[in-house]
């Protein structure tokens, strides 16, 4: 609701707020310090992303208007393995062990079947293949401190997208090693960036925004709204 208003968002420790604060160099472990920043810090304008699930013809261009199938995100959105991992992490376990809960839930889906993907960036078809997950990020550092999208910047007017397509446990390990070592793309990890990203998948895949699991979808549109949100950060 603060997008486009100029009213600043204050970040308090917990959930997606932690991820956003971490990407902004903020406080993630002290409620008192975070509250002080929220009241006395300076404003920084950041981009926001919009996810449109199964867009209508009108929703295929321009910034989307408020609608039941339109969702805002500040950190990331994803589908496939990414969303299944979020969906299967029990709330009680997340409260106790944090991001490690996603590791446990992710293990259940390592052998899920891949899905067919067509990826278009700024009107340009860039990828058509079988894949396991798609992550679209407004910033680079994700859960557990992993930098999946090293070129992402929260105020560059672009979204970054990663497709992860391992065909075996060995390739899963290879993807993890590549991400942790901040290495270039490989056969099971491909990254792009743009302002307007469309994804078509078959069969339909579960999707999420900022860790909130939504519905299954076949066609998804991700679009950036540059510098649309003011966030209170350290002076």
Regions found by a protein language model. Give the residues of each.
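Catalytic core of DAGKc-family lipid kinases
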Residues: 3-132
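Short beta-strand-to-turn element immediately C-terminal to the catalytic PLP-Schiff-base lysine
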Residues: 51-53, 88, 136-137, 162-164, ...
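Glycine-rich phosphate/pyrophosphate-binding beta-alpha loops
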Residues: 78, 82, 135-150, 213
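Short acidic/glycine-rich loop or secondary-structure boundary segments that cap or lie
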Residues: 82-85, 127-129, 142-145, 169-173
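Short Gly/aromatic-enriched secondary-structure transition segments
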Residues: 89, 149-152
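Short, conserved beta-strand edge motifs with alternating hydrophobic and charged residues
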Residues: 118, 129-130, 135-137, 160-164
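ATP/nucleoside-binding phosphotransfer catalytic cores, i.e., glycine-rich phosphate-binding loops
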Residues: 121-128, 153-156, 163-235
């Amino acid at each position: 609701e603060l997008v486009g208003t100029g009213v600043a968002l204050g970040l308090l420790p917990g959930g997606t707020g932690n991820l956003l604060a971490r990407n902004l160099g903020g406080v993630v472990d002290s409620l008192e310090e975070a509250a002080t920043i929220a009241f006395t810090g300076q404003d920084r304008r950041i981009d926001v992303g919009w996810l449109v699930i199964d867009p209508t013809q009108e929703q295929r261009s321009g910034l989307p208007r408020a609608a039941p199938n339109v969702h805002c995100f500040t950190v990331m959105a994803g589908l496939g393995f990414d969303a299944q991992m979020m969906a299967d992490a029990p709330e009680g376990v997340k409260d106790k062990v944090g991001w490690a809960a996603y590791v446990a839930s992710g293990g259940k889906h390592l052998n899920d079947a891949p899905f067919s993907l067509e990826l278009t960036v700024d009107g340009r078809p860039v990828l058509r293949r079988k894949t396991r997950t798609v992550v679209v990020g407004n910033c680079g550092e994700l859960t557990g401190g992993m930098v999946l999208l090293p070129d992402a910047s929260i105020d560059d007017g672009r979204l970054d997208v990663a497709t992860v397509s391992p065909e075996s446990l060995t390739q899963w390990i290879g993807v993890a090693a590549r991400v942790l070592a901040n290495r270039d793309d490989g056969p099971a990890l491909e990254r792009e960036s743009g302002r307007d990203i469309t994804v078509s998948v078959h069969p339909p895949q579960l999707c999420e925004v900022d860790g909130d699991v939504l519905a299954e979808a076949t066609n998804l549109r991700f679009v950036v709204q540059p510098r649309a949100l003011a966030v209170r950060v350290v002076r």
